[in-house]
């Protein structure tokens, strides 16, 4: 028999790149999904500096097994900030509704540069800047903030994610940004309380 159902909402997708070059969010749109949320697992493509394009592609390829060659060919990088990315998406039309979250890895590398990629501890100034950019992302329409502290998430080169060793004060700083925004979700994948523990 057949079923009549409302549209399904897929709260965990990685269409962050595909949404910049395709109006079809397939295969989800082929299966009755009418809304998707992307920016999960702390990986995504904004905010980004031109020098960090390859790193963000390596993260998405490694964490989500999305071919780097497709991302390299498809991403136009016509944005830098997360609000710019949201504006870019807003100019496009899709076969379903999409929502984006601000990814911690991109945010951390944007603010801290190589120190962030190398998993060095964030300073109070770094945290304040990440917090402010998260507030701005929420004002631009982000649904929330995502992070990952799991050893299973690695770049395509096998390196741990920039967020693996993010400390509690850094994560609390991002949570306080959501409080300031007055809304949003915080999604985090974590295998441990402390890396050494």
Label each PLM-derived region with a short phrase.
Residues 1, 102, 106, 149-151:
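Short, small-residue-rich loop/turn micro-motifs
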Residues 2-6, 111-114, 151-155:
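A short alpha-helix capping/helix-coil boundary motif
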Residues 3-27:
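Di-metal (Zn2+ and/or Mg2+/Mn2+) metal-binding site signature of metallo-dependent hydrolases
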Residues 8-10, 71, 117-119, 159-160:
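A short, structure-level motif marking secondary-structure boundaries and short turns
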Residues 13-15, 75, 123, 164:
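A generic secondary-structure micro-motif detector
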Residues 16, 43-47, 106-109, 152-157, ...:
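Flexible loop/turn segments at secondary-structure boundaries
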Residues 21-144:
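Divalent-metal coordination cores built from histidine and acidic residues
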Residues 83-94, 119-197:
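Histidine/acidic residue-rich metal-binding segments in metalloenzymes
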